[in-house]
Each structure stands twice: as structure tokens, then as C-alpha cells.
Amino acid sequence: MLKGNYVNWGSSGQAHALRNALNAMYRLDNTEEHVKNYRPQILVLTGNLSERNHLLNFATSITKDSCLLISAEVIVSDNPDSLISTVTDEEAKCTAWLAKNKYRAFFHAVSSASLSDGVRQLLQISGLGKLKPNILLLGFKNNWKTSKLDDIAEYVTTIGLAFDADFGVCVFRCNSENVTDSENVDECKPLMDQANQEEQRQTNNTELKTSINDCQTFTIEMVEDEFKSENEPSNNAKPKKTICQNFSRKNKTFKKCNFYLKKDLFRQKVKHATIDVYWLFDDGGLTLLLPYLLQLPKSYLEGAKLRVFTIANNKELEHQETSMATLLSKFRVGYTEVTAIPNITKKPDQKSLDEFQESISPFLGTAALSESELLAERSRTWRHLRTREFMLANSSDASLIVITMPIPRRRVCSDLLYMIWLDLLTRGMPPVLLVRGNQRSVLTFYT
């Protein structure tokens, strides 16, 4: 008997699934919120999934398939209305990609004339009822030094918009160079490429000279495993993922190499991991909650040791450490060490000042950064430099650093200076997660 093609005729089970989900949403919308029921619902700006899905891996370690996770992309175009059908098609394609790669997440894309306007749309419309994100996670802008000032302003504006929308904000800097993008590029093609192609068809311009499908050769150097266990001898360490030798398809050629794909980063568990938390300001407890969740099962840092650092005056070091230890015990957050940072406001070392001067030197004398602003913000700059000194001295061996993020103050601090601060707090470190809550309490003393 011949077997025909699969045809979905529908079923009563599918109809009941939709009705049950709808009823559950109604019940949730009428449920009174309480700090004990708080869940981190994350909107992560991954952009193209095949390029930045390591952000999705990291977010999954927090949500653990039990909280809302939305992967989002903003397609910047001069004519965003013309891309509505393209966005719909790509949402379906990327949703299938998420299911194939076993991510419990949704994908959402919008087309907009600018990044900040697109993020504003996402912050307003993502989710439904009370099942909507309350944290915005985005990657660090690594190319800020070579970017236009308008692009830096767009990035900082994005952070400010999230605070205005009463979101918590997380900025993640991987600081890893031994990862690459080479897999699944055809399955989830960048939406920006399609936006460019759509614009070119409308303006009758010439075809794009380069695209993902036109790549001729892709070569990657051999790298070492940065997540290697200390007990394993380095000469026997081998990458757990490799690309097959002399693989070619269409116009692509992948040479023999050993490296880590971004799809695997933050999916493999780290042995003997340590999370360092720099709780510098009270933001409702989000800076403590996220590393606590990263300690739990189903995380790449499962079972990690937690070291907490806070600030104090020299005369109050012991008292502050004792108070913090008591507070963590009340919150039922396990920790291995509590340390108070002394003299956070004193003048930094000359090496740190020289490093800061090197960062600002290309912009001095321009309208983007004035001497008067540097003088007015000197105390905050020194504070960030002193924090960096302490992080370099105490957390260079950590698996992850979680630190309270400074808030951008509009009309007081320029976007460029704020970007320099973020860079100084994260450059040359292990992976760093900058966190700032929305002052909503996410931890409670009571059971």
C-alpha cells in the first residue's frame, strides 16, 4: 500500500491547546503580582540568530525553559513599510530554526527607520498581558571606537528607552575571540541582507556585490579551549566541536580547522566555575538574582561559587561585610565570600588614568567630548576606574563577572563618555554582565 505525503487535517487536540492557552492567559492577567512570583522574562536583541545565538544561549541559562524568552531583531531600512511581508516570512523561518535547535524561545522582528525606534516598538508590543518581558538583554557594542557618533547615540538611547519603559537592563560582553559564525547561515539568513535587497529592487540599483551566499573562502585559525578545566592537561585538550575537513557547498569552502562555534558557547558546562558579583547600588536585587539563577541546574555555570563584592569606607569594612553576609542569608542566596571594596572614591592609579586618557584622546577637542564635561564627571570617572582596578586584581580568574551598570544621565553625561565608561568596566575581563534593575524588588526575606 502506497504511503502518501503527510497532510495536517487538524484535530480537536490542537483546538483545545489553543483554548487552554487562551484561558491560562486570562487567568494570569487577573493574578495579583507578588515579589515571590517574580520571573525574569527576557527580551534579547540577538539580531541574526546565526551570528549572535550565543546571547540566546546565555539567556537560556537564566530562563531555564521556564520563563519567557523572546529573541528579537530590528531591521533598519529607509523604507520599513516595504519589508512587512519579508519580516513575516523571516519570523516563520527563524521560529523553525529555534525549534530545530531546541530553544524554548520566540522570535520577533520589526522593520524601522532606526535602531532606537525599532527597539521602542519591541519594548511596547512584545508579549501579551502579563506574559511580557521585563528585562532587555543586549550585547556590548564592540566596534564603538570605529563607529559614527550617531551609532553610539543610537546604542545608548536604546538603553535609556528600556529604563523609560520600566525594564531592567543587561549588557553582556563576551570578551571571547575564539568563536566564529559558520553554521546554519543558510537556515536563518540575516534579515538586513534581505532588507538591502528589497531596497535595491525598488530603486533599480545594481545587485549587492557581497552577501552570505557569495563568500568564496572562510578560514579560521586554531584556538584553545578557554573553558578548559584546570585539572586537564593543556596538551591533551581538544575542542569538542569541529567542522568537517575540506567541506564545500556552492561557493563556500571551509578549510580544515578546529574552533568553537557561537552556537556552542555558553551551552557547555564550566567545571569549578566562579561568579563574581559587584553589587555597587541597590537596584531591587536583580544584580543578585541573576547570578543566583545562573548557579542552579540547567545552566552552563551550574554549581558555581558566588563571591560578592560591595563598597564601604575604611572604617566600616568589617561592619559592611557582616551586614552583606546577613542580608544574603536572609535572601537565601548561597555565597562563598563577601568582600568590601575600600576607598572607591579615591584617585585611581596613574596606569588607570593613562588608560582612560588613551580612550578619550581621539575625541578631545571635538563637540562630542568637552573638557568641561570631563571635569564635571571626574568623580564618576574615578569611581569607575577604581572599580576596574579592583576587578582586574580580584576577578581575572572568574568565569563570569556581574556588576551593577551605571545609568545614562541625559543632558548631563554625553553618550560617548557613557560608552567609554562601559568599555572600561568590561574591557580585558572574563565575560561581563552589566545589570541594572528598575528598582522593583525581586528578592524577599519571607517564604
Regions found by a protein language model. Name each.
Residues 1-447:
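Membrane-embedded alpha-helical bundles that form conduits across membranes
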